[in-house]
């Protein structure tokens, strides 16, 4: 079997994540080489929301897969559109890292301790909305750039950015998983509890995408199956079903986190899903929690996880989420 070509963005975080997956596949006996692909999201200076959010980093990489320029690709699952082009499949979802958001603030401050009207940088409407829900006094600053550039915007942390940072913000909020993968967990001043800020659906998880035929047969398919983590795939399936049912993209102010726990005295497990929709100014939020006992078999369990996400989305709509954000159901189950 010839070497597997793994398509990746050129950013440090993307290549780090791709190397992590390449290492897993190499441990399964595959020869894997990274192939760098430039995306519109990498070259544009517009905000993520202005670019549409949905699939801005994925489209070029998916095209490379379909055109045979790459064999697999590694995505941050939270950035991947819920709709999938014909001919592509999620071949593996490795074990998830910390799904929480993390605050990096000057002087070791926490969210509670930030001064009145403190400036907090984020490119995520979801993060901004939930931050304003608990701290309406904050000044939210829309930021772009790689992780190091964003860290360098914090006062006193300019050393993180290449050639020095602007140091013009009191804090930034980033995914804890990305900071950890780059070795920057030490910069975190507070891991934001999901009861305060729910993460993006599938945050902390990676998705290994491949051509559909390659996900079913051969050495690559077998290796992908072995690095797939059932717990992570189940959680991500439920969380992303919320986005799909609400026809929302990765830039929508929607948070979701699913957790799998055993049932005492039973062989079954319960999947609990917490979801939130927040007004962009933080003035109103709608939260729901739903649970389901999962069957032991893989496919029925995945179907139940998807249905759980749809149920959560319907409950959000029932409680007025469409009035909070521009949302609609792709189809009602009730």
Curated annotation (Swiss-Prot):
Keywords, sorted A to Z: Porphyrin biosynthesis, Transferase
Cofactor: binding details: Binds 1 dipyrromethane group covalently.
Gene Ontology BP terms: protoporphyrinogen IX biosynthetic process
Residues bearing the modification S-(dipyrrolylmethanemethyl)cysteine: 250
InterPro entries from the UniProt entry: HemC (IPR000860), Porphobilin_deaminase_cofac_BS (IPR022419), Porphobilin_deaminase_N (IPR022417), Porphobilinogen_deaminase_C (IPR022418), Porphobilinogen_deaminase_C_sf (IPR036803)
Pathway(s) the chain acts in: Porphyrin-containing compound metabolism; protoporphyrin-IX biosynthesis; coproporphyrinogen-III from 5-aminolevulinate: step 2/4
Cofactor(s), by name: dipyrromethane
Keyword rRNA-binding: no
Family: Belongs to the HMBS family.
GO cellular component: cytoplasm
Domain of life where this protein originates: Bacteria
Species of origin: Cutibacterium acnes (strain DSM 16379 / KPA171202)
Designated name of the protein: Porphobilinogen deaminase
PANTHER family in alphabetical order: PORPHOBILINOGEN DEAMINASE
Enzyme Commission code: 2.5.1.61
Role description: Tetrapolymerization of the monopyrrole PBG into the hydroxymethylbilane pre-uroporphyrinogen in several discrete steps.
